[in-house]
């Protein structure tokens, strides 16, 4: 019997493959994206220390009332918020880690909003 692997299992395999190549340093930390069925999360991570430097999501008090669901509008708001917080901490250059997701839709919208708000990647 052939069992088709779930989409999430395939995404995790892709993410592991990408993580072998994408590494965040103190000079250029990693901007990681995760999306659940209801929310979108973004973190800027220094992989040498294993610390999260900045984070933003649709669960943040600033976005909770404005951003409803994991859609493009919410992704745009999360991208702008993570860029604003990163620039406040002096982080301008990052490495984008799409988390195994296709660079399309919500992930692309978040990345474009972060770029427009001042992050370089």
UniProtKB/Swiss-Prot annotation:
Ribosomal protein listed as a keyword: yes
Gene Ontology biological process terms from the UniProt entry: translation
Superkingdom of this protein's organism: Bacteria
A Pfam cross-reference name: Ribosomal_L18p
InterPro entries: Ribosomal_uL18_bac-type, Ribosomal_uL18_bac/euk
SUPFAM superfamilies reported in the protein's UniProt record: Translational machinery components
Sorted UniProt keywords: Ribonucleoprotein, Ribosomal protein, RNA-binding, rRNA-binding
Protein family membership: Belongs to the universal ribosomal protein uL18 family.
Role summary: This is one of the proteins that bind and probably mediate the attachment of the 5S RNA into the large ribosomal subunit, where it forms part of the central protuberance.
Name this polypeptide is given: Large ribosomal subunit protein uL18
Source organism of the structure: Caldanaerobacter subterraneus subsp. tengcongensis (strain DSM 15242 / JCM 11007 / NBRC 100824 / MB4)
């Amino acid at each position: 019997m052939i069992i088709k692997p779930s989409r999430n299992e395939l995404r995790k395999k892709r993410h592991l493959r990408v993580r072998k190549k994408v590494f965040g340093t103190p000079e250029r930390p990693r901007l990681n994206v995760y999306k659940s069925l209801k929310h979108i999360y973004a973190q800027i991570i220094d992989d040498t220390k294993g610390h999260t430097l900045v984070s933003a999501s649709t669960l943040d008090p600033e976005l909770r009332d404005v951003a409803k669901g994991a859609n493009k509008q919410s992704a745009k708001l999360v991208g702008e918020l993570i860029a604003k917080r990163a620039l406040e901490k002096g982080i301008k250059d990052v490495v984008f880690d799409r988390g195994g997701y296709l660079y399309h839709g919500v992930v692309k919208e978040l990345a474009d909003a972060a770029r427009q708000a001042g992050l370089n990647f």
